[in-house]
């Protein structure tokens, strides 16, 4: 087992794009940890609409007010990334009961791959509980207003890329 630091958390995701729900979760988790690493996954199997570098830049801009948060893109197995940064906690968000089955399965798999790391689930603030990146992308793709769901820079990037 690797040496891990339970004061360091990794919040992984595709963040395609980062939303106000993601930002809320990081903002509420930031005081709980010495450091949070937002790991932006390449995720080619998901066919992201925004390139990795742009997703990283948008997340950095959205989270820049938190001194203990860093944003790093990665294209490896999550378990390898977590070990690389020395984190002892995987941070995940649960919006609804429908998220639980998938997240439970992922947490169980990660427990086998990185048993020294704990998974911690946080729920979003109620006003963000329905927001998902895929819904934000779809609304933007169809010409809808997503300014209430994502930062202005994300809204502009979606308009340019979709």
Curated annotation (Swiss-Prot):
It catalyses: (R)-4'-phosphopantetheine + ATP + H(+) = 3'-dephospho-CoA + diphosphate. The record marks 22 as: Transition state stabilizer. Its EC number is 2.7.7.3. It is an enzyme of class 2 (transferase). It is found in: Cytoplasm. CDD domains: PPAT (cd02163). Transmembrane segments: none annotated. Its main location: cytoplasm. Substrate binds at residues 14, 46, 78, 92. It holds the Pfam family CTP_transf_like. GO terms for cellular component: cytoplasm. GO terms for biological process: coenzyme A biosynthetic process. Keywords: ATP-binding, Coenzyme A biosynthesis, Cytoplasm, Magnesium, Nucleotide-binding, Nucleotidyltransferase, Transferase. One of its GO terms (molecular function) is pantetheine-phosphate adenylyltransferase activity. The keyword Zinc does not apply. Reversibly transfers an adenylyl group from ATP to 4'-phosphopantetheine, yielding dephospho-CoA (dPCoA) and pyrophosphate. PANTHER family: PHOSPHOPANTETHEINE ADENYLYLTRANSFERASE. Belongs to the bacterial CoaD family. HAMAP family: PPAT_bact (MF_00151). This is Phosphopantetheine adenylyltransferase. It comes from Xylella fastidiosa (strain 9a5c).
């Amino acid at each position: 087992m690797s040496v891990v630091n339970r004061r360091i958390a990794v919040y992984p995701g595709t963040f395609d794009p980062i939303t106000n729900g993601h930002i809320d979760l990081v903002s509420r988790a930031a005081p709980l940890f010495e450091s949070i690493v937002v790991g932006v996954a390449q995720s080619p199997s998901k066919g992201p609409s925004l390139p990795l570098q742009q997703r990283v830049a948008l997340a950095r801009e959205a989270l820049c007010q938190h001194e203990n948060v860093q944003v790093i893109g990665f294209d490896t197995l999550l378990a390898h990334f977590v070990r690389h940064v020395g984190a002892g906690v995987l941070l995940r968000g649960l919006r609804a009961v429908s998220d639980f089955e998938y997240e439970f399965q992922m947490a169980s798999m990660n427990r086998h791959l990185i048993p020294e790391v704990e998974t911690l689930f946080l729920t979003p603030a109620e006003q963000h509980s329905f927001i998902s990146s895929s819904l934000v992308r779809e609304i933007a793709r169809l010409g809808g207003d997503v300014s209430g769901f994502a930062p202005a820079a994300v809204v502009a990037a979606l308009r340019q890329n979709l």
